[in-house]
Amino acid sequence: AEPPAEPTAETQTVEETAPEATEEADEELPEETQSEEKQVISTVPQYFQNDYPYTMYGSGTIMTSGCSIVSLAMVASYMADHAYTPDELAHYFGGRAINNIARLEYGNKMLQLACRKAENWHVVYKALQEGQVAIVLMNHNSIFTNSQHFIVLAGINENGKIIVNDSN
């Protein structure tokens, strides 16, 4: 089955997964994909940047510039035997922002999470079909932001829609 049209975003796929989410993308999957068995994932925690208005992160706070650390906290909590919070990870990384792919990979390494960088949307979609989750960097052409913004793709629901954990 073919994945939906390729979004214009850098992606990172985190392995060993199975999730929950809160928002669902409006984009329908191709009909032949919808007839396949779907994996419903419901255990990725949801955190929000607005819950951390005073926790320093990079040159701002988690609320103003912490989508990457919030996304990492969601996935790390899901993958590890520990409920990581965004403020805990911000302190762990010394308040240094990890708002790019290389630093996010570093965060995964420091937390000893299995991850791999996906080269295109097809790799991400296949990972979701296999029950994995993904942290993706959306660009200004997406419905999530007018600049850049990290979100978590937490799976594919029973209706064939991608489950999105958005920190905003």
Q: Which role fits each region the language model picked out?
A:
Residues 71-168:
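Conserved active-site-adjacent core of cysteine acyl-enzyme catalytic domains
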